[in-house]
Amino acid sequence: MKRIFTWLLIILFANYCLAQITFEPPTEPAKIRALKVSQTINIDGKLDEASWFSAPSITEFIQKDPTQGAPASMSTEAKILYDGDYLYVGAVCKTTNGKSDLRTQNMQRDFSYFQNDLFGIAIDGFLDKRNAMVFQTNPYGTQREILVMDGEIFNREWSGLWSVRTQISDSTWTVEMAIPWNTLRYPPACDKIGVILTRNIRSNNEFVSFPAVPRAFNVYRMPYEAILSGIEPPPPGANVQVIPYALVNNERVSVDGDLTEEKTDLKLGGEVKWVTGPNSVLDFTFNTDFAQADVDRQGGLSK
């Protein structure tokens, strides 16, 4: 009887602990709006166009780690604009001690998620609460992008077409992103998408997001997404991305130090990615160099 009672206590304690690190997605998702712009947005990280001052602010960033549910220790103000070509994302990330608060491991694209300060946005174009395109940057404008499926499957090999610039001051670092609509996937007549905004404050080992996401899950658990409305993207259409490559092989044969034969081979090839519709992509590879080819990636369509 004593043993049964002990096990009951353990189970109750485990359930209590689990309840502290997870919670259900809200029945009414957070709602935010984007501002349509007609002026040219210069992607320089300064956020000094008039449209940025007029756009609604997003400031309710909540800790995921280390203290779930607590306000962020350093404030973040994000805003979203759009026009017929781009979705623009801007953010002002406050710091306590200026540049000394920032941690950046390297300047390589697709940098480490955990070892760098970063700001990012996940976009669920179909509102299926499963799939998302993630765009991130560190304080020095290095890009990182991921495809996320079900909050558990990650394609880190994906490279989307987008641009970003950042600025660092004594009290902030600012982000200005321009994401082409033809990089994103969404249905015809789209007027809203799902988003999760994130920031890693590495000096405090702190990760914050809007909306809040339980620490038991990856931060890109899209059932917790906010709804971004007020958008009028162009109809989704086909676009083509070409990734060429060239390999040069030079062979020399010498006998007793004398060159007797020299041969140079040039090999050309590449990959063509053709987005034929809002939820279909065709990949073509020609003259593949299998020594350089990626292994098969796990992926999924949005529907």
List PLM regions with ranges.
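Structural preference for beta-rich elements and adjacent junctions enriched in aromatics
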Residues: 20-303
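Bacterial Sec-dependent N-terminal signal peptides
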Residues: 1-26
